[in-house]
């Protein structure tokens, strides 16, 4: 969904069994951004999202699947996902993208490596394995076990009452219950 002169420059292809969405429009500096470009994807299951963009990703409904891997590389938008998972892998590798997660997850593996926000305080997870190498803070909700590693100035804030908490601190950041 986009303006009539824009829609033709939005390309969708499948490469190596992956859906790739590209905006090939030029002269973007003269465009009117009052009407955003929206791409709607309806699929029964998804197992990986590779994000390298300036746009936003939002799940309109709860995404229910066994496992999901989300990798953000060089993006600067906002990712909002409502999830029902057994295993979740969430990696904020580069850029300033913000990741906001909600729902339920059995085991969550998370890594923040750059300036973006990793906010999973609304994702109720049984076990969380998280590493923060960022200057930004991370937020998680954990019920059973937390394994947290700090490698920079960013903190890891957790809510819930995990029975087992393991921390490795190699930087000025802290692991803080809130």
Model-derived segments and spans:
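Extended, compositionally simple hydrophobic/Ser/Thr-rich segments
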Residues: 39-40, 46-178
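Short linear S-[DN]-x-LW-Φ motif typified by the pepsin-like aspartic protease active-site region
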Residues: 1-32, 36-50, 58-62, 178
